[in-house]
């Protein structure tokens, strides 16, 4: 299968690309250059004609998080759009384009999944987040014994809680 990853500033796109390639798919990454962008509102003007031309070369368009304009262009060009959320709640999922038949949307937040399912969104699925364990294992193998002892734990939280310094607000309430 010929897959295009719609690239943006997110941390785990390389892991997804590696997984697709591991299963024998041809994968390219494409980073859109908006025609214009408003720094105050964040609204971007997209070149729909250019994107449609790019998308026509692929069987599937994939993105981490959901982009309404990508869905609309996939609907128009007859391409499948697969989106896997990495943020929650993701406001873009409240756009009318979630009802496009081209979509296959995967959401890691089960409560948000249920909410959208109850709103009648079809082709929406629950899928937890994932990681390339081979990549992480190779990083761990390069650590010294002292680093491994210093950073070892029974449970680790990796990621962010969407609030600046929220750990500082809860650290005194955590068990030792």
Regions found by a protein language model. Name each.
Residues 6-119, 134-143:
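Extended catalytic core of nucleotide-activated donor transferases of GT-like folds
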Residues 2-13, 119-176:
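Nucleotide-sugar donor-binding catalytic core of glycosyltransferases
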């Amino acid at each position: 299968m010929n897959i295009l990853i719609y690239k943006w500033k997110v941390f785990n796109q390389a892991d997804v690309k590696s997984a697709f390639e591991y299963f024998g798919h041809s994968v390219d990454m494409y980073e859109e250059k908006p025609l214009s962008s408003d720094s105050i509102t964040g609204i971007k003007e997209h070149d729909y004609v250019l994107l449609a031309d790019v998308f026509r070369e692929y069987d599937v368009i994939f993105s981490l998080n959901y982009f309404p304009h990508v869905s609309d262009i996939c609907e128009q060009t007859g391409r499948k759009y697969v989106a896997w959320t990495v943020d929650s709640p993701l406001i873009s999922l409240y756009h009318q384009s979630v009802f496009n038949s081209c979509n296959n949307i995967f959401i890691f937040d089960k409560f948000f999944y249920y909410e959208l399912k109850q709103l009648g969104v079809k082709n929406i699925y629950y899928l937890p987040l994932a990681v390339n364990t081979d990549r992480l294992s190779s990083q761990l193998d390069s650590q010294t014994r002292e680093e491994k002892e210093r950073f070892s734990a029974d449970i680790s939280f990796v990621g962010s809680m969407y609030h600046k310094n929220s750990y500082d607000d809860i650290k005194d309430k955590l068990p030792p």
